[in-house]
Regions:
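Solvent-exposed, non-transmembrane regions of integral membrane proteins
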Residues: 1-192
Length: 192
């Protein structure tokens, strides 16, 4: 029923959730005085971070979406449950570059939820063309809108990425660092 890739993802998700819950349970062990055992808490915090890292990387790899559009002004672009309205394109000038800036609105019914302004920048010295990504970060999902160099004046090539759980990758690294540092601190205090 499942492909080999899906079984691997299910296995990794299950193992990471198990690691997170077991680490939380072990980290909250109490001694005879009903106080939390501090060295175990640091170790468990680092393991929770590692489990969360695996969980968020697998979830991102599994549920991330990308769609490429050829769009013109006033087009509506749909990716999963997200609707984007391509509002405008204009030329702007920066300190050392000229840019083509597009405006996309993330819509909910007729309400604008967020605004994206990706750019194509042309630098004169040295001559370079770059695409500047517009990113909106939410708690559970990051959304990227990238505009590529237009092939003609009627359409703009647009890539929209929906990346879930990116924030949790950063949170997991912070948890691992705090857990590791606290385990080291409590170990040094115990030695003295």
């Amino acid at each position: 029923y499942f492909s080999e890739l899906e079984l691997t993802q299910i296995t990794l998700l299950t193992l990471s959730l198990t690691l997170v819950f077991v680490s939380i349970k072990n980290g909250l062990r109490v001694n005879n005085n009903y106080s939390i055992i501090k060295p175990a808490l640091g170790k468990s915090l680092a393991h929770v971070g590692f489990g969360l890292l695996i969980l968020s990387v697998v979830a991102n790899g599994t549920f991330a979406r990308e769609k490429i559009f050829q769009a013109k002004v006033n087009d509506t672009l749909q990716i999963d449950n997200y609707t984007f309205k391509f509002d405008s394109v204009e030329q702007t000038k920066g300190v050392n570059f000229n840019a083509i800036t597009a405006t996309f609105h993330l819509m909910n019914d007729q309400t604008v939820m967020d605004t994206f302004t990706p750019e194509i920048r042309v630098y004169s010295n040295p001559p370079t063309v770059t695409s500047e990504t517009s990113i909106i970060r939410k708690l559970l999902t990051d959304i990227y809108v990238v505009m590529n160099v237009p092939e003609n004046s009627n359409f703009v090539n647009v890539r929209i990425h929906v990346k879930p759980m990116i924030s949790f990758i950063w949170l997991s690294v912070i948890l691992m660092a705090i857990g590791g540092l606290s385990a080291i601190v409590f170990r040094f205090k115990k030695i003295r």
